[in-house]
UniProtKB/Swiss-Prot annotation:
Main location: secreted
Gene name linked to the record: THCAS
Name this polypeptide is given: Tetrahydrocannabinolic acid synthase
Span of the signal peptide: 1-28
Lineage: Eukaryota, Viridiplantae, Streptophyta, Embryophyta, Tracheophyta
One Pfam short name: FAD_binding_4
Length: 545
């Protein structure tokens, strides 16, 4: 080899070495690259409190775990984000998106941390969590009966501050006060006012979304297709929701509730259930009559301990005690509702009563409990949901209730929630959430437990009940609800050329005929599929546009 050839070879080797070294450094340090990029966009100064946490920070684990609502996912084996960003304004979200794109990190956006599969804070590839805890302002305009709510606010905060302004206004969101509005509203969001006003997503009139290019869009600038998609189609598919503008609704000055327990042999419970399933969805929209079933240990007349299934029938009625008792005695005398079973509450106290964070027997609760983000007991849990379109036969319901005995006492529960009311009148394509006319009720199966080592046992029980009920629920497709996300329905391999075909399997369960429109919106606004997870809407490949 002559000198010039050797020199060329040596220079090439040096260049190759440095290139390789640089590539390895950039791959090895996406966290450092992200931090450098972020600090260029958002200079760290005195006016700027700490926004970014890495695993080197003392507060990293407490911030990560603080809003993990499902204790299944607090474990050493759960994948952890390289970075947690806690933005306090839109510019911080913009910087996070641009820098994550630049260095090749995925984003998970967390509002309240209630995602049933933990997908607002878990990813199988290197990722950043955008934790919206510091973006929780609520600006209410009583005159126009609207409010701007930042996506990190909780339902409890929304209900509390609306009530502070006007006791006869509220918003039709869910029951649990610690749920964040970012995910809840963008997945649909049902609750006590659903039969009067529809879902939370039906009552959104504007939004601020930060898109894949880091631009902040409102309803006008994003256009009606994207605005349609984020109200029930999962905002995380299209960007990061920073705020919602919501339409407030009228609520009565008093409402009446009861929650009666029925402890009898299963055939007797099934008779009550059968009456319930044939009448609850037909009631006037001012009455919600829900039911749930759970096992409990009791002592029988002979002093022996035994496990029985208990049924609970619970109401929310827009009106007084006398009217409700009269209605129940005429329409459902088998329940035997008496005046002494009922309580009249203000609307805000009704909200608290059914919040799951106070004792049912406690009458002296303060509405400030709605502001407590740590209210309620956290457990590990698993949940699956079905929609029922025709009555479940009594013989089948006997067997379904008997399956509660296969689970630990008090660990498994079925909740049945009536549809009907205004839900019958809203088009299935009004927003991506399609489950409207023809749905009698939703039925969900859940298990909760304490110990990590019991995860598989309880998850498998929920799966077994879900499999058993297959013939009795909606079919072709078997419908599902995005806010009770279920990865058993299928996952999408975004590297696969068949990702649309894979996604359609679960997509049509969540969205019905609306799935294809969601795909078109995704293809238009995020063609390179930056915002993705195991169950995200895929864009069509370029040749299909």
């Amino acid at each position: 080899m002559n000198c010039s050839a050797f020199s060329f070879w040596f220079v090439c080797k040096i260049i190759f070495f440095f290139l390789s070294f640089h590539i390895q450094i950039s791959i090895a340090n996406p966290r450092e690259n992200f931090l450098k990029c972020f600090s260029k966009h958002i200079p760290n100064n005195v006016a700027n409190p700490k926004l970014v946490y890495t695993q080197h920070d003392q507060l990293y684990m407490s911030i990560l775990n603080s809003t993990i609502q499902n204790l299944r996912f607090i474990s050493d084996t759960t994948p952890k984000p390289l970075v947690i960003v806690t933005p306090s304004n839109n510019s911080h979200i913009q910087a996070t998106i641009l820098c994550s794109k630049k260095v090749g990190l995925q984003i998970r956006t967390r509002s309240g941390g209630h995602d049933a599969e933990g997908m607002s804070y878990i990813s199988q590839v290197p990722f950043v969590v955008v934790d919206l805890r510091n973006m929780h302002s609520i600006k209410i305009d009583v005159h126009s009966q609207t409010a701007w709510v930042e996506a990190g606010a909780t339902l409890g905060e929304v209900y509390y501050w609306i009530n502070e302004k006007n006791e006869n206004l509220s918003f039709p969101g869910g029951y649990c006060p610690t749920v964040g509005v970012g995910g809840h509203f963008s997945g649909g969001g049902y609750g006590a006012l659903m039969r009067n006003y529809g879902l939370a997503a039906d009552n959104i009139i504007d939004a601020h979304l930060v898109n894949v290019d880091g631009k902040v869009l409102d309803r006008k600038s994003m256009g009606e297709d994207l605005f349609w998609a984020i109200r029930g189609g999962g905002g995380e598919n299209f960007g990061i929701i920073a705020a919602w503008k919501i339409k407030l609704v009228a609520v009565p000055s008093k409402s009446t509730i009861f929650s009666v327990k029925k402890n009898m042999e299963i055939h007797g419970l099934v008779k009550l259930f059968n009456k319930w399933q044939n009448i609850a969805y037909k009631y006037d929209k001012d009455l919600v009559l829900m039911t749930h079933f759970i096992t409990k240990n009791i002592t029988d007349n002979h002093g022996k301990n035994k496990t029985t299934v208990h049924g609970y029938f619970s109401s929310i009625f827009h009106g007084g005690v006398d009217s409700l008792v009269d209605l129940m005695n005429k329409s459902f005398p088998e329940l035997g509702i008496k005046k002494t079973d009922c309580k009249e509450f203000s609307w805000i106290d009704t909200t608290i009563f059914y919040s799951g964070v106070v004792n049912f027997n406690t009458a002296n609760f303060k509405k400030e409990i709605l502001l407590d983000r740590s209210a309620g007991k956290k457990t590990a849990f698993s949940i699956k949901l079905d929609y029922v379109k025709k009555p479940i036969p009594e013989t089948a319901m006997v067997k379904i209730l008997e399956k509660l005995y296969e689970e630990d006492v008090g660990a498994g529960m079925y909740v049945l929630y009536p549809y009907g009311g205004i839900m019958e009148e809203i088009s299935e394509s009004a927003i991506p959430f399609p489950h409207r006319a023809g749905i009698m009720y939703e039925l969900w199966y859940t298990a909760s437990w304490e110990k990590q080592e019991d995860n598989e046992k309880h998850i498998n029980w929920v799966r077994s009940v879900y499999n058993f009920t297959t013939p009795y629920v909606s079919q072709n497709p078997r419908l599902a609800y995005l806010n009770y996300r279920d990865l058993d329905l299928g996952k999408t391999n975004h590297a696969s050329p068949n990702n649309y075909t894979q996604a359609r399997i679960w997509g049509e369960k969540y969205f019905g005929k609306n799935f294809n429109r969601l795909v078109k919106v995704k293809t238009k606004v995020d063609p390179n599929n930056f915002f993705r997870n195991e169950q995200s809407i895929p864009p069509l490949p370029p040749h299909h546009h």
